[in-house]
From Swiss-Prot:
Family in the record: Belongs to the AIM21 family.
Function per UniProt: Involved in mitochondrial migration along actin filaments.
Listed GO CC annotations: actin cortical patch
Annotated region described as Disordered, given as residue ranges: 1-95, 107-522, 548-679
Protein name from the UniProt record: Altered inheritance of mitochondria protein 21
Alphabetically ordered keywords of this record: Cytoplasm, Cytoskeleton, Phosphoprotein
Pfam families: Aim21
Length: 679
């Protein structure tokens, strides 16, 4: 791509400098300036020539409604994620050891705790142990924590509610490490606290609900939050409300709470089982059960939680604060017993990886054991049972049994007949050669063989007495075939033509008279009638113009005479035949005179005239049908002769026209005019 097409990305505009909420010293302000971004110039920023591809997703001042709002600093490095499985295993091991020690202590001091009374020394010892423990925790926090930058202090002062959400992974890891490091140091203090709690319980039975847990057994403190903030030089302002305390309590790590809840529950159960007289006091616990959130908030209204968080955060001012807050450092025991469902829920959230590992290991072990067991052959404890005998077939029905008996009888009869015929022929020959004893033995053998041959039928075998129908037809004589044909015909005649079926009309009603009066027609197949009729007739009718154009004047005269003869009745023909002939003769003479001399010399021209007259009379006498005319034509040659004469006459006329038989042109024209007028 050319350089002109590629877009130029403008530089990102620098942010404005945020205002400081609190003034800082010179050293701190120098560090902040070194770490902060370079300040923007006093003049207006340069507007980019082109629009950037993606718009910066930052909150503007008018959207938030605050012009001077401190923004949290994004860490330069991403926090390293640590595996929680090892830490959880360490926590579980430490808690199991602590529980064993507590159980041993409770079993030793259980008998003496009932007779003891509450003393001021025990209370003072518990307070001193709690103060000593807080001091140890603050010292360890100072060792492990790093000095934060001044910018982080400002962020903490500006927005305390969002601190718990900035780096939750670091806080979780640090809290886990602190629990594992201080587990040994807390063992001694816990023993003292248990003694104090037992003394308090024995001294006053009415306050069992309030003093059931020792001094240190309370809702855990969010130490990780204070570690992130670092060691502050001054305490937070006194305007912190109860809502801040509640928010801190909800962000506390669940592992420490789980440990203390387990301890509290086990101690409470052991005390109840060992002291049955105190069961009446525990009835009020079930009545006062509340939700998880209310339990955590109401358990410590303004007690040691606030003091402990402040002491853990400020290591330099610990001794001065302890002296002023010794009176409020008395531990507070929650009034309601925690729910078991909550414990199970927390435990499931805390230990998901360990449970998955245990389940996977159990599955692997079960698979390995099943594979090993499958390889080892097993000896059956019981001997396999024998198969039951096949079921007995049911008896056939009466009809099937009767049919089988009939077939067996027929087969036996056929075999017996065949065996007798073969045995008679064999016995006649053997009688001449052997004695009666030999004859009887031979007959028995022949009977036996004949029976065997008949019993086993092979494909293609036929009984000798019965032939297939195809062979019988071939071998039978023509006389027998004719007899069979006549028998079949007689059976066909005698049998009905077709089965008469009753109509599907309504039953119980009479048919109408028209249908009932109809007679059935019965046809006789023996009689045959022949009828002959004419399917078609030929009639030719030509127009007069075509006839005059095609025929000669002589033929025209003949046709005119035929028409006249038809118009004259037959009686007149019989009376005056001579007159008709006389009338015809002068007409013919006139025609002959008109003809030229060449035509007179031709003898063929006279033949058609004479023959035509004779034939005309014959045709006029009878009007024959086309079939009769065709038959007469085939028998007589008169029609062929007439056709030949007509052809000859046509040739003569053509030659005369072509040769110019007319002497003058005028005669030819007059002849044409005469023919035209005649048309």
């Amino acid at each position: 791509m050319p350089s002109e097409v590629t877009p130029k990305v403008p530089e990102r505009p620098s942010r404005r400098k945020t205002s400081e909420l609190f003034p800082l010293s010179g050293s701190e302000s120098g560090d902040i300036k070194a770490n902060s971004e370079p300040p923007t110039p006093a003049g207006t920023p340069n507007v980019p020539t082109r629009r950037p591809i993606l718009k910066a997703k930052t909150m503007t001042s008018f959207e938030s409604g605050m012009d001077q709002e401190s923004l949290p600093k994004v860490p330069l490095q991403r926090p390293v994620r640590r595996s929680t499985t090892e830490e959880l295993n360490n926590v579980m091991n430490n808690t199991s050891k602590e529980l064993e020690e507590i159980e041993s202590l409770i079993s030793k001091h259980n008998i003496h705790s009932v007779s003891r009374k509450k003393s001021p020394t025990s209370v003072q010892e518990g307070k001193a142990a709690a103060i000593h423990q807080n001091g140890q925790r603050s010292a360890s926090d100072n060792k492990t924590s790093t000095n934060p930058s001044p910018l982080e202090k400002n962020e903490h002062k500006g927005d305390e509610g969002n601190e718990s959400a900035i780096s939750p992974s670091n806080s979780v890891n640090k809290s886990n490490n602190e629990v594992t490091e201080h587990s040994d140091s807390e063992d001694l203090t816990e023993k003292q606290k248990v003694h104090a709690a037992l003394d308090n319980e024995a001294g006053d039975g009415s306050h069992f609900e309030e003093k059931l847990i020792p001094g240190d057994m309370k809702v855990p403190v969010d130490v990780s939050k204070d570690v992130e903030e670092g060691s502050l030089n001054a305490l937070p302002p006194s305007g912190i409300t109860e809502s801040d305390d509640k928010a801190e309590k909800f962000t506390k790590h669940p592992e420490s709470s789980l440990e203390e809840l387990q301890k509290h529950q086990e101690q409470q159960e052991e005390k109840i089982f060992q002291n049955p007289t105190d069961e009446e006091s525990t009835t009020s616990l079930n009545e006062k059960q509340e939700g998880k959130d209310n339990m955590e908030v109401n358990s410590q209204p303004q007690g040691p939680s606030d003091t402990e968080t402040v002491i853990a955060a400020t290591s330099s001012n610990v001794p001065s604060q302890i002296a002023s807050e010794e009176e409020n450092d008395v531990p507070v025991i929650p009034r309601s017993r925690p729910k078991k469902d909550f414990e199970a829920h927390v435990q499931k959230e805390e230990l998901p990886n360990t449970q998955e590992k245990l389940v996977s290991e159990e599955c692997d072990s079960t698979l390995i054991s099943t594979e090993e067991e499958s390889k080892i052959p097993k000896i059956p404890s019981e001997r396999p049972k024998r198969r039951a005998p096949p079921p007995v077939p049911k008896k056939p029905s009466s009809r099937i049994a009767a049919f089988q008996e009939m077939l067996q009888k027929q087969q036996q009869q056929d075999l017996h007949n065949n065996g007798n015929s073969s045995a008679t022929t064999a016995s006649a020959d053997i009688a001449k050669k052997h004695t009666d004893s030999s004859i009887t033995s031979d007959t028995t053998k022949a009977d036996f063989t004949s029976k065997l041959n008949g019993l086993f039928a092979l494909p293609g075998m036929v009984n000798p007495g019965q032939l297939p129908p195809s062979l019988e037809k071939k071998l039978s004589s023509p006389d027998t075939e004719s007899k069979l044909g006549t028998q079949d015909q007689s059976q066909a005649k005698t049998g009905p033509l077709g089965g008469t079926r009753r109509g599907r009309g309504p039953r119980g009603r009479k048919l109408p008279s028209k249908v009932a009066s109809v007679e059935k027609i019965e046809e006789d197949d023996n009689t045959n009638k022949i009828e002959i009729f004419n399917n078609w007739n030929v009639s030719s009718s030509f127009s007069k113009e075509k006839i005059l154009m095609d025929t000669t004047p002589g033929e025209q005269a003949e046709r005119a005479l035929d028409e006249k003869s038809k118009s004259i009745p037959e009686e007149q023909r019989e009376q005056s035949p001579n007159k008709m002939e006389a009338a015809l003769c002068p007409f013919e003479l006139d025609e002959q005179e008109k003809l030229p001399a060449n035509a007179e010399s031709d003898p063929l021209s006279q033949l058609p005239q004479t023959n035509a007259v004779g034939n005309r009379k014959a045709i006029s006498e009878e009007s024959l049908s086309p079939s009769e005319a065709i038959a007469n034509r085939d028998q007589n040659d008169t029609t062929e002769i007439q056709e030949q004469q007509m052809e000859d006459q046509m040739e003569v006329d053509m030659e005369r026209e072509l040769s110019g038989g007319y002497e003058d042109v005028d005669s030819a024209l007059h002849s044409e005019e005469a023919s035209f007028h005649s048309l």
